[in-house]
């Protein structure tokens, strides 16, 4: 059984983008290749339990076990040594990616306090989109009573689009709530 957004992409989005940009082949149409969720945890230097809690939260959000990211080099100013765990990240592809994107757009984003849409300027120039989430409690999988601290995370959506304009059209076709 394919994800709802994946079918929506094949049936509606592809045709819409071919009409808008005049692609000659279906394979030229931009698509989302992966979504990366990253949680940077600077406070993990002092408390090892922080990594466990964050990993648990990210597992619930993504439905997949994240990897713990370690410091590449020592930085005395931040009191970290090489190999210290400083974050956690998970990469979603395929069906899980589309299911996460569906939940994110329809359920999680509307739960953000004072939500007026996401910025249309957070593209990196190569057709990828980044969005920062200030609190992990916007996700319905996270129970408010069971969290130890409010943590933010970065969501990076990687596409095959050649330009920001194409990537924005792709995400807008997925009903991404962009600010005007």
Curated annotation (Swiss-Prot):
What parts of the sequence cross the membrane? Answer: none
Which biological processes are named by the entry's GO terms?
translation
Fetch the InterPro entries from UniProt: Ribosomal_uL5, Ribosomal_uL5_bac-type, Ribosomal_uL5_C, Ribosomal_uL5_CS, Ribosomal_uL5_dom_sf, Ribosomal_uL5_N
Q: Which residues form a coiled coil?
A: none
What are the protein's UniProt keywords?
Ribonucleoprotein, Ribosomal protein, RNA-binding, rRNA-binding, tRNA-binding
Q: Looking at the record's lineage, which domain of life comes first?
A: Bacteria
Any one GO MF annotation of this record: tRNA binding
One Gene Ontology cellular component annotation held by this UniProt entry: ribonucleoprotein complex
Q: Which cysteines are joined by disulfide bonds?
A: none
Fetch the PROSITE patterns from UniProt: RIBOSOMAL_L5 (PS00358)
What the entry lists under NCBIfam families is as follows:
PRK00010.1
Q: Which family does it belong to?
A: Belongs to the universal ribosomal protein uL5 family.
Q: How does it assemble?
A: Part of the 50S ribosomal subunit; part of the 5S rRNA/L5/L18/L25 subcomplex. Contacts the 5S rRNA and the P site tRNA. Forms a bridge to the 30S subunit in the 70S ribosome.
Q: What does this protein do?
A: This is one of the proteins that bind and probably mediate the attachment of the 5S RNA into the large ribosomal subunit, where it forms part of the central protuberance. In the 70S ribosome it contacts protein S13 of the 30S subunit (bridge B1b), connecting the 2 subunits; this bridge is implicated in subunit movement. Contacts the P site tRNA; the 5S rRNA and some of its associated proteins might help stabilize positioning of ribosome-bound tRNAs.
Protein name, per record: Large ribosomal subunit protein uL5
Q: Which organism is it from?
A: Ralstonia nicotianae (strain ATCC BAA-1114 / GMI1000) (Ralstonia solanacearum)
């Amino acid at each position: 059984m394919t994800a709802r957004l994946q079918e929506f992409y094949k049936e509606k989005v592809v045709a819409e983008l071919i009409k808008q940009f005049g692609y000659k082949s279906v394979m030229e149409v931009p698509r989302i290749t992966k979504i990366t969720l990253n949680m940077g945890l600077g406070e993990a230097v002092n408390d090892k339990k922080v990594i466990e809690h964050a990993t648990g939260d990210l597992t619930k959000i993504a439905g997949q076990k994240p990897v713990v990211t370690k410091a590449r080099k020592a930085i005395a100013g931040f009191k970290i040594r090489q190999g210290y765990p400083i974050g956690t990240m998970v990469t979603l592809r395929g069906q899980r990616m589309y299911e996460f994107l569906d939940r994110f757009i329809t359920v999680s984003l509307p739960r953000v306090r004072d939500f007026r849409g996401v910025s249309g300027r957070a593209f990196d120039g190569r057709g990828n989109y980044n969005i920062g989430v200030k609190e992990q409690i916007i996700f319905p999988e996270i129970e408010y009573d069971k969290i130890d601290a409010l943590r933010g995370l970065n969501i990076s959506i990687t596409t095959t689009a050649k330009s920001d304009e194409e990537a924005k059209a792709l995400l807008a076709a997925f009903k991404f709530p962009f600010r005007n």
